[in-house]
Amino acid sequence: MIRELEYYGSHILRRKADIIPEITDATRQLVQDMYETMVAHKGVGLAAPQVGESLSLFVMCVEGETEEGDLIFCDFPKVYINPVLSNPSEDLVIGREGCLSIPGLRADVYRPQSITVTAVNLDGQEFTEHLEGFPARIIMHENDHLHGVLYIDKMEEPKDIKKFKASLEKIRRRYHAHVKPEDRAS
């Protein structure tokens, strides 16, 4: 089922997500729904808070990059439950980021070139993988959602931040009707 997205202005996007104590049928259904929602909105990753669930879970549908820099997409998303990031590379690279919860806007963000993630999959098995380039950027972006952080919080250019203020307010107003009453920004 395609779920309704949470947009800038929703408090759930600013909360620390809850750890998932066990994988249930509801968890599996949430992953399926997140995958369908991500595909419907042409995303490459999606975190549970973006579909209104304050749970430590995200999905990603990029396996890697070719030597030419083209993305290699997967048939079903990789699932990261209760992820923990470690070993960020010291070298930072700038990359353009967008977010399904902040439609129509993109900005340059500095992030480590590589990262290690340890998480649990849908079978309850812990795994660790090391990612580089764009897949690493997706992991860091989605993991930020689990800590109430949006990519706009990482923007460094004052001119970009100033430029975004009016656009963010328009997004907040436009999608405010979709925000649950308890999650309305003041």
Curated annotation (Swiss-Prot):
UniProt cofactor note: Binds 1 Fe(2+) ion.
Gene3D superfamilies per the UniProt record, alphabetical: Peptide deformylase (3.90.45.10)
Residues of the active site: E142
Keyword tags: Hydrolase, Iron, Metal-binding, Protein biosynthesis
PANTHER family: PEPTIDE DEFORMYLASE
Pfam families on file: Pep_deformylase
Family: Belongs to the polypeptide deformylase family.
GO biological process: co-translational protein modification; translation
Reported cofactor(s): Fe(2+)
Signal peptide interval: none
UniProt: Fe cation binding residues: C99, H141, H145
E.C. no: 3.5.1.88
GO terms, molecular function: metal ion binding; peptide deformylase activity
Gene encoding the protein: def
Name recorded for this polypeptide: Peptide deformylase
Reactions listed under catalytic activity: N-terminal N-formyl-L-methionyl-[peptide] + H2O = N-terminal L-methionyl-[peptide] + formate
Enzymatic class: hydrolase
InterPro entries: Peptide_deformylase, Peptide_deformylase_sf
Described function: Removes the formyl group from the N-terminal Met of newly synthesized proteins. Requires at least a dipeptide for an efficient rate of reaction. N-terminal L-methionine is a prerequisite for activity but the enzyme has broad specificity at other positions.
Organism: Chlamydia caviae (strain ATCC VR-813 / DSM 19441 / 03DC25 / GPIC)
